[in-house]
């Protein structure tokens, strides 16, 4: 076999492969055996029909076609191995010559991972925010905890912000009650802005038994129109928050004193922020590398992924009785802008994958069994399924190699992060140990092939 590689672009090559007919003989012989298993000829057992009989009965051309279908993947794979390129898509094959006795010539165009010259990670400095926990941070957490233990006490006074009221409400448009426009006996926090615009202002100052009408600007399919709403207050209750003392600490936690509870909250906030700092370091390292490297992406893969995501959006909108443009309009985004954002996201995801795949290849990183197990557990947890179910899903969908590649990229990012210099905004060195994040969190994956 002879093969040549022509570089069409930094992300696409063209193979020209020539295979002599002598080299095809094993493939032709195997094709005869396959065909013999499929034909039934009186006097011969299945699989035992001689080639001359097959030629006379169904024609040698059928056998040669089978041999061609088997030979192309085999010799294409050999050509890829010899060229030592990382293919990332299915090849576009064109047979330029194949005749009985003359051998085979074909071309294959395919997308490849671009060559990336990585900088020495030890020359890179990543700056992150420092981890600090103030008394105000602890106070805010304590206040939120106390709020969860608050009780509601009926009061005989006008409603004000922070009160909980029991209400009946009807919303009409052009005199007709809207679908889902009736609320009966609902508990509502005044000032929470959770139902319709204008409700909070209408409720303030009302006592139990009083009603009010107000204009309610609508959203969704009625965006731009204004309904008329009527609300009646049936009861007003005041939220009573427990005092922050040792008794509260014993009620709300396993600690005996408020100071012990405060110390625990401070430590928990610090732990969370160290994880956030680690995530920030990963993101800023990736962005630093992307900014310093020119990493091309194959347009065919980008276009295919953009189309796939557009179809997902279309189905999502359709399931809600809308089209994609209408759904995006509710979110304040045009279809054109959305497509531009999706394309930019896909291109960035591909660049990150190429970057990390290059690290994997250069450093010959491999996954240990425990690392793969951790990755599967983390991914399963994020998806809300058991690790066994997630692993079985990967097997059923033939996506185990994609999961392994994704886990390796996470390991590559960790490898880089361990070798760069990390400082906070004051210039102090940062030790990221203890703030590690799962490999599954690294970057969303784009299916390449």
From Swiss-Prot:
EC number: 5.2.1.8
Annotated ranges, domain PPIase FKBP-type: 162-242
Any GO MF annotation of the entry: peptidyl-prolyl cis-trans isomerase activity
Keyword Oxidoreductase: no
Predominant subcellular localization, coarse grouping: cytoplasm
Listed name of the protein: Trigger factor
Catalyzed chemical reaction(s): [protein]-peptidylproline (omega=180) = [protein]-peptidylproline (omega=0)
InterPro entries reported for this sequence: PPIase_dom_sf, PPIase_FKBP_dom, Trig_fac, Trigger_fac_C, Trigger_fac_C_sf, Trigger_fac_ribosome-bd_bac, Trigger_fac_ribosome-bd_sf, Trigger_fact/SurA_dom_sf
PROSITE patterns: FKBP_PPIASE (PS50059)
Protein family membership: Belongs to the FKBP-type PPIase family. Tig subfamily.
GO terms (BP aspect): 'de novo' cotranslational protein folding; cell division; chaperone-mediated protein folding; protein transport; protein unfolding
Biased composition (Low complexity): 438-449
Region (Disordered): 428-449
């Amino acid at each position: 076999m002879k093969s040549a590689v022509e570089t069409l672009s930094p992300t696409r090559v063209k193979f020209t492969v020539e295979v002599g007919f002598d080299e095809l003989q094993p493939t032709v012989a195997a094709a005869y055996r396959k065909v013999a298993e499929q034909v039934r000829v009186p006097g011969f057992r299945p699989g035992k029909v001689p080639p001359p009989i097959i030629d006379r009965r169904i024609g040698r051309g059928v056998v040669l076609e089978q041999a061609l279908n088997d030979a192309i993947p085999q010799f294409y794979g050999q050509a890829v191995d010899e060229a030592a390129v990382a293919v990332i898509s299915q090849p576009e094959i064109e047979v330029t010559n194949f005749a009985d006795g003359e051998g085979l010539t074909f071309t294959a165009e395919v997308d490849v991972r671009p060559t990336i010259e990585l900088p020495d990670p030890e020359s890179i400095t990543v700056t992150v925010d420092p981890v600090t926990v103030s008394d105000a941070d602890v106070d805010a957490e304590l206040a939120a905890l106390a709020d969860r233990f608050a009780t509601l006490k009926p009061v005989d006074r006008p409603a004000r912000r922070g009160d909980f009221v029991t209400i009946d409400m009807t919303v009409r448009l052009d005199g007709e009650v809207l679908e889902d426009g009736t609320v009966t006996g609902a508990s509502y926090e005044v000032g929470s802005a959770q139902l319709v615009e204008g409700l909070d202002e209408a409720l303030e100052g009302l006592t139990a038994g009083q009603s009010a009408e107000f204009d309610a600007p609508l959203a969704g399919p009625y965006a731009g129109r204004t309904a008329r709403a009527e609300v009646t207050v049936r009861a007003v209750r005041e939220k009573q928050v427990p005092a922050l003392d040792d008794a509260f600490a014993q009620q709300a936690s396993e600690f005996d004193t408020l100071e012990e509870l405060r110390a625990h909250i401070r430590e928990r906030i610090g732990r969370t922020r160290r994880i956030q700092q680690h995530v920030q370091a990963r993101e800023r390292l990736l962005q630093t590398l992307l900014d310093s490297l020119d990493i091309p992406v194959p347009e065919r893969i980008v276009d295919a992924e953009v189309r796939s995501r557009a179809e997902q959006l279309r189905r999502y909108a359709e399931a809600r009785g809308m089209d994609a443009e209408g759904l995006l309009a509710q979110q304040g985004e045009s279809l054109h802008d959305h497509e531009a954002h999706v394309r930019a996201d896909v291109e960035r995801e591909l660049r990150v994958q190429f970057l990390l795949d290059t690290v994997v290849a250069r450093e010959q990183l491999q996954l240990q069994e425990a690392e793969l197990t951790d990755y599967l557990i983390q991914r399963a947890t994020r998806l809300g399924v058991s690790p066994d179910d997630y692993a079985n899903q990967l097997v059923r969908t033939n996506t185990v190699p994609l999961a392994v590649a994704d886990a390796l990229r996470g390991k590559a990012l960790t490898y880089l992060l361990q070798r760069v210099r990390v400082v906070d905004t004051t210039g102090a060195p940062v030790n990221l140990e203890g703030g590690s994040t799962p490999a599954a969190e690294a970057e969303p994956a784009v299916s390449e092939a």
